[in-house]
């Protein structure tokens, strides 16, 4: 089971919060102190709370739930896309479209449009269109891919969200809250932790800090998925064995 150490957190700069003049008083329980006008996050609490978040994500994956990674700020974009893809999950790393969760049926129509255009370019159907029409479709495809590419395979609402900087992603958090979708988030000293189900206190601006925490959350999804597959395989083998036993008993009785 993946773990996170104090050394890893320190090396990645997870303990550095925002300037003391830019803070949310609700984050006070997670703050160790201040140094040179910067709040220092209590990493002992980060370790403990990360463990709770990890266990939750692991259990969700084990139960077959899907997760949506959300991080549209520049520092988070690469980590969000890479780690979501590594664990076979979905992501939004460009712009959160209002209604992406609360109006998912409409968003799905745009996803289907993107898939259709992709298919046209893949099978050569696009050649039946004029050069101008093909160019317009390519522009539409690029635009849709940028905003919806990370959720192209998401056929239903996710079971949970992992968010980097809930202050920046407040619309996503609000939509998840309305729908009762649990939120796990990296929460810095300037954020409101109230709408977050699993708070991970930490630096949400440094690329190294974001990458470390995001990769560990992806590990939880992978390990939970592996545990699910093992359990399903065990259940299948058990059912096959039981069926074989029944067949064997019938043969003996007939003999």
Swiss-Prot record:
One of its GO terms (cellular component) is cytosolic small ribosomal subunit. Keywords: Ribonucleoprotein, Ribosomal protein. It holds the Pfam family Ribosomal_S2. It comes from the Bacteria. One of its GO terms (biological process) is translation. SUPFAM superfamilies: Ribosomal protein S2. NCBIfam families: rpsB_bact (TIGR01011). This is Small ribosomal subunit protein uS2.
């Amino acid at each position: 089971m993946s773990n996170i150490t104090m050394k890893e957190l320190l090396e990645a700069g997870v303990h550095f919060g925002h300037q003391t003049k830019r803070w949310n008083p609700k984050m006070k329980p997670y703050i160790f102190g201040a140094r040179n006008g910067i709040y220092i996050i209590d990493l002992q609490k980060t370790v403990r709370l990360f463990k709770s978040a990890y266990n939750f994500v692991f259990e969700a994956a084990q139960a077959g739930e899907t997760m949506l990674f959300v991080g549209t700020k520049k520092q988070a974009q690469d980590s969000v896309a890479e780690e979501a893809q590594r664990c076979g999950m979905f992501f939004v790393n460009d712009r959160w479209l209002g209604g992406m969760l609360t109006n998912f049926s409409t968003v799905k129509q745009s996803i289907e449009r993107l898939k259709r255009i992709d298919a046209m370019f893949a099978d050569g159907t696009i050649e039946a269109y004029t050069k101008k029409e093909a160019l317009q479709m390519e522009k539409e495809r690029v635009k849709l891919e940028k905003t919806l590419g990370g959720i192209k395979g998401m056929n239903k609402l996710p079971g949970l969200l992992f968010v980097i900087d809930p202050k920046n992603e407040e619309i996503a958090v609000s939509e998840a809250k309305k729908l009762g979708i649990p939120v796990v988030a990296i929460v810095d000293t300037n954020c409101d932790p109230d709408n977050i189900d699993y708070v991970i206190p930490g630096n949400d601006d440094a690329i190294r800090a974001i990458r470390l925490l995001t990769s560990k959350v992806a590990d939880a999804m992978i390990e939970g998925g592996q545990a699910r597959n093992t359990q399903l395989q065990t259940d299948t083998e058990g059912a096959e064995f039981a069926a074989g036993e029944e067949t064997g008993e019938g043969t003996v009785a007939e003999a």
